[in-house]
Amino acid sequence: MTKVVYPGTFDPITKGHLDILVRAAQVFDQVTLLVLSNLQKKSLFSLEERVRLAKSAIEESNAPSNIIVDSYEGVTVHYLEEHGIRLIIRGLRAVSDYEYEIQLFLANKYLNSQVETVLMPTSLRYQFVSSSLVKEMVSFGLDVSEFVTPTVERALKEKLEVKQ
């Protein structure tokens, strides 16, 4: 069985993330969406909220059943080692993503030479979508229904109203 991990902060999960996730689920036997705690980023949603939103988004998207959601507070490579997984999948939107992903690939290879990274370009309609962009759009009252699922959109509106 070929297992792959799709790691990220997913703050929140977008349809761009779901695009990569669903396409990966068509290629691999099991895909774990790994919601990470990242000390370098100040998250709008807590780790638990991001996991809940990811699960809801996957359900709302009628995604394949070979997708599981997990969370981790640590280095992705350590999670892989703990679960006997060797593959990471990452989405690419632009050339700038590629440069960042190569840095992550090299760091992961340094930590564990057995870990491989698969880079998958995002579908054209989501090339510009990011969690940061979606949060900014919601904060300005703009419609983001093309970029996130209804549950995520509601959660963003609720969370950002509290913050204002």
Swiss-Prot record:
Molecular function as annotated in GO: ATP binding; pantetheine-phosphate adenylyltransferase activity
Pathway assigned in UniProt: Cofactor biosynthesis; coenzyme A biosynthesis; CoA from (R)-pantothenate: step 4/5
Site for Transition state stabilizer, residues: 17
Catalytic function, reaction form: (R)-4'-phosphopantetheine + ATP + H(+) = 3'-dephospho-CoA + diphosphate
UniProt keyword annotations, A-Z: ATP-binding, Coenzyme A biosynthesis, Cytoplasm, Magnesium, Nucleotide-binding, Nucleotidyltransferase, Transferase
Pfam families named among the record's database cross-references: CTP_transf_like (PF01467)
InterPro entries: Cyt_trans-like (IPR004821), PPAT (IPR001980), Rossmann-like_a/b/a_fold (IPR014729)
Cellular component GO terms held in the UniProt record: cytoplasm
Chain positions recorded as substrate binding sites: 9, 41, 76, 90
GO BP terms: coenzyme A biosynthetic process
Binding-site list for ATP: 9-10, 17, 91-93, 101, 126-132
Subcellular localization(s) per the UniProt record: Cytoplasm
Listed SUPFAM superfamilies: Nucleotidylyl transferase
Cofactor: Mg(2+)
E.C. numbers: 2.7.7.3
Quaternary structure and partners: Homohexamer.
Function: Reversibly transfers an adenylyl group from ATP to 4'-phosphopantetheine, yielding dephospho-CoA (dPCoA) and pyrophosphate.
Assigned protein family: Belongs to the bacterial CoaD family.
HAMAP family: PPAT_bact (MF_00151)
PANTHER family referenced in this protein's UniProt entry, alphabetically: PHOSPHOPANTETHEINE ADENYLYLTRANSFERASE
Protein's UniProt name: Phosphopantetheine adenylyltransferase
Species lineage: Bacteria, Pseudomonadati, Coprothermobacterota, Coprothermobacteria, Coprothermobacterales
